[in-house]
Amino acid sequence: MARFVPSPPPNCLSYKSEGRLGEQDWQAHFKVPCCGVDPSQLESEEAEVDVRERDTQRDREPKRARDLTLRDSCTDNSMQFGTRTTAAEPGFMGTWQNADTNLLFRMSQQVPLACAGRVLGADFCPNLEEPDQRLEVQAIRCTLVNCTCECFQPGKINLRTCDQCKHGWVAHALDKLSTQHLYHPTQVEIVQSNVVFDISSLMLYGTQAVPVRLKILLDRLFSVLKQEEVLHILHGLGWTLRDYVRGYILQDAAGKVLDRWAIMSREEEIITLQQFLRFGETKSIVELMAIQEKEGQAVAVPSSKTDSDIRTFIESNNRTRSPSLLAHLENSNPSSIHHFENIPNSLAFLLPFQYINPVSAPLLGLPPNGLLLEQPGLRLREPSISTQNEYNESSESEVSPTPYKSDQTPNRNALTSITNVEPKTEPACVSPIQNSAPVSDLSKTEHPKSSFRIHRMRRMGSASRKGRVFCNACGKTFYDKGTLKIHYNAVHLKIKHRCTIEGCNMVFSSLRSRNRHSANPNPRLHMPMLRNNRDKDLIRATSGAATPVIASTKSNLTLTSPGRPPMGFTTPPLDPVLQNPLPSQLVFSGLKTVQPVPPFYRSLLTPGEMVSPPTSLPTSPIIPTSGTIEQHPPPPSEPIVPAVMMGTHEPSADLAPKKKPRKSSMPVKIEKEIIDTADEFDDEDDDPNDGGTVVNDMSHDNHCHSQDEMSPGMSVKDFSKHNRTRCISRTEIRRADSMTSEDQEPERDYENESESSEPKLGEESMEGDEHLHSEVSEKVLMNSERPDENHSEPSHQDVIKVKEEFTDPTYDMFYMSQYGLYNGGGASMAALHESFTSSLNYGSPQKFSPEGDLCSSPDPKICYVCKKSFKSSYSVKLHYRNVHLKEMHVCTVAGCNAAFPSRRSRDRHSANINLHRKLLTKELDDMSLDSSQPSLSKDLRDEFLMKIYGAQHPLGLDGREDASSPAGTEDSHLNGYGRGMAEDYMVLDLSTTSSLQSSSSVHSSRESDAGSDEGILLDDIDGASDSGESTHKAEAPTLPGSLGAEVSGSLMFSSLSGSNGGIMCNICHKMYSNKGTLRVHYKTVHLREMHKCKVPGCNMMFSSVRSRNRHSQNPNLHKNIPFTSID
């Protein structure tokens, strides 16, 4: 049973060793009672202790004289400390090795350290395992000449400075280190953990940084030891393995990041270098360093030239180095790297980290005996420049294949025979002129393996000469650099650049791509989305500025941060290296998403990526990394889109199909809910069950207007406001102030991708007949398939739902200036528009839901069309695009009832002044017809049709009632009429005398829209008729009975065409079964007939829309054409 023994006095750092005195003698020497020992027993031994002290004092003077003589006779002048022969004292290293009585090592084995910073301090309590163990106390004396310090006492501020003599720790520690190598240069020692502990204390005890040369040498010694021994040495000296591999301590015990470091002096470094002459693993390296030290080449002379000259010099010297060898060494097999080097295989060790839980040896995948088994199939996952490759940066010419030949005893560890071809060189920053170095400690059995590796590296390097390129990370070859880049980004790229827009989680492989993406004001590019597994860890790490809270190391967790909604990502399972208990795994797995500089370092290290002391040493607390993260605020002109959680899709939507591996390697685009990619624009009109979607009027809520919505650069609120929909009645009057197509560019980006390939507004009216005609079919929404149903319920029409359109009253003048831009009269048209809007009676009826209730809920997550609820407003928008797209876009000009499935078509129609000329002027007030002549309407209509089609075909359509007018003209005639609803509003109330005058105005308005849009006969003959019919159904001003009957009769055109089961060509009167066949007929047979001048009374026709528009917009060509009012 172990007994407690009190510590020595605090003014002396002492060690235990086997000797002739017992435990009571040691306690009596310090006059300290021991637990369980009678104090009277200590007094009985007092006389013997006095005799021992007197003998020790008498022998001290001869010993110092011998030390002085040895120092004067030493040929090495750099040795400033006193040395003793091995026979001088039996406590030197030369005699301790075989007996295994190293005091430093045995003390560290038996003493639990109370503080990592004062390992060699005086506050320790040895636990004796055997009651009869014989101990002796020996002080570490100062070896400097004329210093009478008997025992090293660590300083309160600097542990390496003795409080008694003010000399350093190295001057005292040499008292216990062997100098046998100075007298027997041909002999080498076996590397043992106790000896390495003593030598390591010279450079690690009380310091916070390690000189590079000493670290190179100490790494060689550590490579021979077991990992448990290495960890014990480091922890005993106040270092963690992570700090040692880094080369300096990043954070102190309190967690503070250090900005200054204590390091041993240059004189102490020279003294310590001599200790490495004792081992064959380091002897040749030290000899070369000594030669360079004497020649003065170890210190690089500062250059007065610029950095470019320095870079040119270094690059010119590096041309002799084999790139293939460097690439192979950077990505060599982990088994060829020592276990203490394999742990930090990324740049994360250069930055602050957090300790989570101490990781035990079984969790790290260590075998029971501490050996690291070789795994040839595993490779490093990152080509990062870390400390582990410090020794491998040398060319083939620098590696000397001649091993150091010496008598080597059997090794204690099998890892000694797994050493790699390592150059014994200093880093270039210490000695850039160094070009060659010998290699030591290579067995003869390694030559075949080394030659095979070099041959393989040469074979890999020759791949580039064949036109192929190989990946530096895994060695695979590819046809070209583009394929290699895709492979590298997908497999090996861990350093990514995140978009600076808040809420956008896009990551890019280059700053150039990231900056180009961040500068794009299009909010669609910055929408949050779920990414593939490769980017989940980055999204999780960047979800907050502060360090996220860890719920469990292995369970799923949610990272939260203030000011941002939680990201519902779950942590992937731990690396298989950590979960597999087999001893064949590596010590630690490769770190992921590690950034090379603090502003980009956001990754949270897993427990397997930590290095914690196995003992009960205090570890650094969790330090928030927010101080090292630079948040780049977005420019004021860039939108700040709030993050929207897209964790679940709507119930009816399936997951989007997986992308190809090549596509997933690039920055991931927005993953939307499932979207029908078919040509919905061409097929939407084919649905016979769709009700009339041409809305009479639309009222815009002024409170929802946003000037930010109007500017493409300030479309901040696009995603929060434009998702709201309005349940509006057929009788609502829409405001005339609207946005032009150019103002809708940010919103237009949400259109189907098929529209993105179509020409812009400025080009659409002049070029691209195919695009123009294919979009005309999107303009007017159909309702011809249900004429009977629509006429049967004149007073109970279902409410039409239209997506809210955002306008701003301040944009009225800009809107009119756009009209003037296309027609050459901005100021006059603005004045006309002002007078026109002042003459209108704007009404804002209450908005109704499909059930007839007021739409009082402003929740943007509910579809007011079908009353479905969604997870987010973004899901609602996708739902509208996929389901209710036909009900969204109505012409923004008051009085025009054309509706379109896309904003682009609607905006192009709204911006055409010729289609709304008579709606924007008061000339219609002067044209009136006698109210007693209701039958004049048909005659005028026939005359009008004769003027249009007189030279092309006769009016011989006697078989059909009122079917002589083409669809476009019929649409104009029927515009504004349909059913009689007493509560409905007039479309245009410009009359003051009679309703017939109003009807004349309305008919004149319809006549101006005879074409409805460019080339309406090409793709929208059915659309025009449906538009007219649905307009009639949706608009019903109060008219005299006779006029209403006349209008009802005119509806039979579309009714007959729909009831006959086919669609008639209005030019050759052939019947076709579906609209698709009719469209093909128009394109192939009547292409020239399609582009007729849109000015009523002008019979000019053109082969292209561009020519027709140029003709139609020229008012000088239509001066002699009188306006005709048709009833």
From Swiss-Prot:
Zinc finger (C2H2-type): 469-492, 861-884, 1063-1086, 1091-1118
GO molecular function: DNA binding; rDNA binding; zinc ion binding
Gene Ontology annotations of biological process type: endochondral bone growth; mesenchyme development; roof of mouth development; tongue development
Name recorded for this polypeptide: Zinc finger protein basonuclin-2
PANTHER family reported for this sequence: DISCONNECTED-RELATED, ZINC FINGER PROTEIN BASONUCLIN-2
Subcellular location: Nucleus
GO CC terms in record: chromatin; fibrillar center; nuclear body; nucleus
Protein's gene: Bnc2
Cysteine pairings via disulfide bonds: none
Comp. bias intervals (Basic and acidic residues): 49-67, 698-708, 747-772
Main location (coarse class): nucleus
Organism: Mus musculus
Disordered: annotated segments: 44-67, 386-450, 675-772, 955-976, 996-1041, 1107-1127
Domain of life, per lineage: Eukaryota
